[in-house]
């Protein structure tokens, strides 16, 4: 049995990252390991996922958790990237350095690496991965990025941990959004690019119009209330407020259940 400390963007309101956490927990369940996770909200991860959380920005608590662990495990996500902020790379590199200073194992699983546009981001990411004891990426592009920034090892390739989520139980009382025989398409959007999502809004506003005119009902899915809300609202307004939205979901399981009522998903 090992004591594992997980690290990622967990318990911060992003249901995609939480899907990775929950998938990893489901995959490793029954193996006898003691697990804690660094997270944005310890109460949230305990109530939703049944795992003890450590405040991710309280480095005194983080240090004590590392002292008590056997390995620091990164279950996945695109956390080594500088497209949103270089602080993400700096934070996760610091965790790796703290773990190795204490003689702990560091395991990178299902990593989506990049974009890494700045020299500092590339340098810190290369250092972090070269310090790791095992590296697994979730796509060939991430493997190529690691090679380009100076990673000296040979990463393994594996699926995203979210694929370890169990199939949801279909609930008959969940609402359907299709009307008059229309099929339903779930749409997940994120603000992206230097224009703060303007191109995303324009593209998906047009997409929703095309779908509706061709007999499909588009439904906007809020995966991260802090990041997605404004983009979803703008897409809805561009269509006269007529695009259904799914908001305030509490866990990846809630997302899965809603998706059982859909015919397709575009992200």
Regions found by a protein language model. Give the residues of each.
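Active-site anion-handling motifs in enzyme catalytic cores
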Residues: 1-267
């Amino acid at each position: 049995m090992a004591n594992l400390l997980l690290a990622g963007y967990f318990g911060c309101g992003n249901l995609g990252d939480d899907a990775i956490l929950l998938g990893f927990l489901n995959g490793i369940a029954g193996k006898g390991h003691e697990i804690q996770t660094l997270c944005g909200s310890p109460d949230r991860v305990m109530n939703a996922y049944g795992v003890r959380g450590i405040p991710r920005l309280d480095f005194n608590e983080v240090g004590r958790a590392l002292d008590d662990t056997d390995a620091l495990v990164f279950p996945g996500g695109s956390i080594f990237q500088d497209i949103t902020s270089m602080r993400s790379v700096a934070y996760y590199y610091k965790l790796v350095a703290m773990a190795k200073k204490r003689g702990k194992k560091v395991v990178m699983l299902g990593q989506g690496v990049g974009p890494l546009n700045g020299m500092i981001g590339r340098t810190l990411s290369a250092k972090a991965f070269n310090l790791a004891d095992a590296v697994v990426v979730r796509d060939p592009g991430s493997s190529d990025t690691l090679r380009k920034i100076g990673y000296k090892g040979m990463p393994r390739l594996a699926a995203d941990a979210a694929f370890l989520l169990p199939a949801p139980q279909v609930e008959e009382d969940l609402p359907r959004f299709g009307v008059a025989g229309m099929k339903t398409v779930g749409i997940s959007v994120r603000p992206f690019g230097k224009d703060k999502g303007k191109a995303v809004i324009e593209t998906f506003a047009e997409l929703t119009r095309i779908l509706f005119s061709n007999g499909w009902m588009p439904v906007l899915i809020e995966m991260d209330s802090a990041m997605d809300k404004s983009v979803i609202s703008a897409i809805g307004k561009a269509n006269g407020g007529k695009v259904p939205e799914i908001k305030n979901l509490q866990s990846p399981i809630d997302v899965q259940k809603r998706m059982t009522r859909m015919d397709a998903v575009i992200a």
